[in-house]
Regions:
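Signature of uroporphyrinogen-III synthase
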Residues: 1-248
Length: 248
């Protein structure tokens, strides 16, 4: 069984792909995504960085205001880049294998970047690492277009916990540091014993950064996907190392 911690509105495709492998799934949303009213920046930018696919979706109505040529457009990873390309927006670069701010900043373009106006399109809150690094030599602004609202513990969460713990070979899919933190909080509210059991299960994470935090929190069996796409997660689950997973 696979525990999916994404917002319910974004879990459908992954759930379907996993079920098609003959593997059961349980939904465990840790937060939901809400659109927020964004203040349109007045200045022109040299560089725009989109942090997530959600950032692309919720900023789309502002594209005519913020994407003014000449401009260079980057994303935090391939999924976000694909989302922009689908909307006919040219993407100048992105980390190909590991979606992270650190990998993005190691690209040659950013190592030499200075005296530029940069806009980071993202959700409200989150890591300040990218901005703090870039603003040493540049002027950096945020354009926040959505917010993450943590989920309360519901009947769905309680049912999913119990179903998930009925099998010994369950796998948890974690998309972000926030998902990891909120999952622990929700499971702990249900039962400290359940949380201890969760930490014995394998988890699949989407970056080395999440892996390191999961280690600190007590998880032992941690796998990082090569790419954070639904298909890569499914390919990993369907690989030889995961044939032990209880199937439908």
């Amino acid at each position: 069984m696979i525990l999916i911690t994404r917002p319910l509105a974004q879990a459908t495709n992954l759930k379907s792909l996993i079920n098609n492998l003959g593997i059961k799934t349980a939904l465990f949303p840790t937060f939901e995504i809400n659109k927020i009213k964004a203040e349109i920046p007045k200045q022109k930018f040299d560089v725009i960085i989109f942090i997530s696919a959600n950032a692309v979706d919720y900023a789309e109505q502002y594209f005519n205001n913020i994407i003014v040529e000449p401009i260079s457009i980057f994303t935090i990873g391939p999924i976000t880049a694909k989302k922009l390309i689908e909307k006919d927006i040219k993407v100048d670069g992105y980390p190909k294998n590991n979606s992270s701010s650190k990998v993005l900043l190691n690209m040659p373009y950013f190592k030499d970047l200075k005296d530029s106006e940069i806009l980071i399109v993202r959700g409200k809150g989150g890591s300040e690492y990218l901005k703090n690094t870039l603003q040493v030599k540049n002027n950096v602004n945020y354009f926040e277009v959505y917010e993450r609202v943590p989920c309360d513990l519901t009947r769905l969460h309680s049912q999913s916990i119990k179903e998930f713990l009925k099998v010994d070979d369950g796998v948890i899919v974690i998309n972000s540091l926030e998902s990891l933190s909120l999952m622990i909080e929700l499971v702990n509210k249900e039962s400290k014993i359940f949380l201890d059991q969760f930490k014995t299960r394998e988890i699949i994470v989407l970056s080395d950064r999440i892996k390191e935090q999961a280690k600190i929190l007590g998880f032992k069996k941690i796998t990082v996907t090569l790419n954070p796409s639904d298909q890569d997660v499914v390919d990993l689950l369907g690989s030889k190392n995961n044939k032990k997973i209880t199937r439908i």
